[in-house]
Amino acid sequence: MRYITTPIYYVNDVPHLGHAYTTIIADTLARFYRLQGHETRFLTGTDEHGQKIEEAAKLRNSTPQEYADKISFEFKKLWDEFEITYDIYARTTDTRHIEFIKAMFLKMWQKGDIYKDEYEGHYCISCESFFTQSQLINDCSCPDCGKQTRILKEESYFFKLSKYQDKILQWYEEKDPILPKNKKNELINFVQNGLKDLSITRTSFDWGIKLPQEINDDKHIIYVWLDALFIYVSSLDFQNKGENAKFWPAHVHLVGKDILRFHAIYWPAFLMSVDLPLPKFIGAHGWWTKEGEKMSKSKGNVVKPKEVVDAYGSEAFRYFLLREVPFGNDGDFSENMLINRINAELSNEFGNLLNRIIGMSTKYSQGNISKEGVLKFYNAELNQAKEHLNLAVEFLENLQCNRYLEELFKALSVANLAISKYEPWSLIKENKHEQANALVALCANILAKTSLLLSPTLPKSSQKVALALNFEISSANYTKMILDNELLDFKANPCEALFPKVEKALLKQEIKEEPKKEESPKIKIDDFAKIEIKVAKVLDCQNIEGSEKLLKFQLELDDKEIRQVLSGIAKYYKASDLIGKQVCVISNLKKAKIFGHESDGMILSAKSGDKLVLIAPEQLVQNGSLVG
């Protein structure tokens, strides 16, 4: 049995390229497992609770439920256009899920894994997550999305995440569940640095699931991530031992790299707490840019999946996303690269091979293609293609989607090269009809086997090949043609071009929008006067062990005062390059403890896009000079 899930997508905005990528990978896997004969369930859906949804609904003069219904419908509509064959469309507002999450919360509470306390810290509304000071970028920005965090203080229930630290590390070691493999070390380092207990309720908004009645505390809403993760189980009707309950645990959770921590640390701990088995694999993919730039409305470079599909078709888009980038790496969307893939691979290698087979078989044997003679004349080519096909299966099972497609097109190349090498038209002229017909049969069998394995990614095109050669894409033929490596006879039928050549770019260019500037709240001059900014000289600067972001400065403000200040600029500056330079520092902030080190002040910097520069006097001035 195979159970595949995408994340349930947050409905604060319409579907984007990242959503499409995850879902197309999941759909390819689900189709592949069905083709292999596995009983399969594929879940996708929408995450509809939380502060972001509440605020987005208010902006649109809508209730949260009305807003969630609208965006959830947009996701379903897009997945239909992409040929997505999900079995379960899950929503966190479903009554069955709400009752299940309350039962799970109560079970954790009764086990002693939940306790009540007070939390104060940096909270990112966009990511619905708390962060420690040491995790922040530039002292106040979210490390995941880059948006400014808020200091939030509220009563909260906490989950004893720290209790499961060793068990999570043991799971990584014994089961090796993280794909791609290089992501595992990042998680191990994070967990080994120490897991803090997790705040799992909120009181600052209303849109969410209330605590179980047994706990008798109506103020609290269950944390959106605790709510959302358990939908993978609740949607199988697990609590009622429904028909789909047997599919747990999941074979693979597919996620973007930004939410790997939630799935690979929080989720296994939650499952351990309620005594449920853990998923077999968690696969984390990268992000997408457009032509080397981060996508944003202000740049006018947002790739809208529906527009790409309308212009080039869902199959070309599905193929491009999976073929273009290794799973786990960041990808770059380029319309020119999409066109190149269509013309060079889908049209030339794939579609043109079908045209050649139909043309030759019609001309040489009235469309009848017999496997007789293939092993006699072309056994080497057949074995070469078989190696590529077997590798393709292996790569897809390990989520290496680009390598899977690469190997399939190498198999097609074996057939195309065989035609060029042996020239069936020349064989016919030499009266070598048996060898010529065997060559056509070799190519037809390679194309049929390849199309069978391409069908999870290109379902419509593969079906056209099956109709043109008169065979069936089925689990029975997977066993016969791939596992048993049998050859088939075919009857060729006329077929339209699978992928016509694309002569010019078809996407409309977006008009660049002027970025909307958010007005900061006005302050009085008296308030500003309270801030003391001084010039200081960097006497020493060092990296902090265990942190990729923090630098530790020893600053001289005047002859008598030396201060230690921490700043999250290690990604932008080398520590040794800053020694001897002057910087500007807010000198009258309360002392803070960051990553176990005292920090007495804040070094000023300016950030523009991906660049950050320190604020410094234009000319050398006396240390301790006031700015302002």
Curated annotation (Swiss-Prot):
Record GO cellular component, one term: cytoplasm
Gene3D superfamilies referenced in this protein's UniProt entry, alphabetically: 2.170.220.10, HUPs, Isoleucyl-tRNA Synthetase, Domain 1, Nucleic acid-binding proteins
Keywords from the named record: Aminoacyl-tRNA synthetase, ATP-binding, Cytoplasm, Ligase, Metal-binding, Nucleotide-binding, Protein biosynthesis, RNA-binding, tRNA-binding, Zinc
Pfam families, per database record: tRNA-synt_1e (PF01406), tRNA-synt_1g (PF09334), tRNA_bind (PF01588)
Enzyme class: ligase
Localization of this protein: Cytoplasm
Enzyme Commission number(s) of this protein: 6.1.1.10
Note on how the cofactor is bound: Binds 1 zinc ion per subunit.
Molecular function (Gene Ontology), one example: methionine-tRNA ligase activity
Protein family (similarity comment): Belongs to the class-I aminoacyl-tRNA synthetase family. MetG type 2A subfamily.
Protein name (Swiss-Prot/TrEMBL): Methionine--tRNA ligase
Organism encoding this protein: Campylobacter jejuni subsp. jejuni serotype O:2 (strain ATCC 700819 / NCTC 11168)
Gene: metG
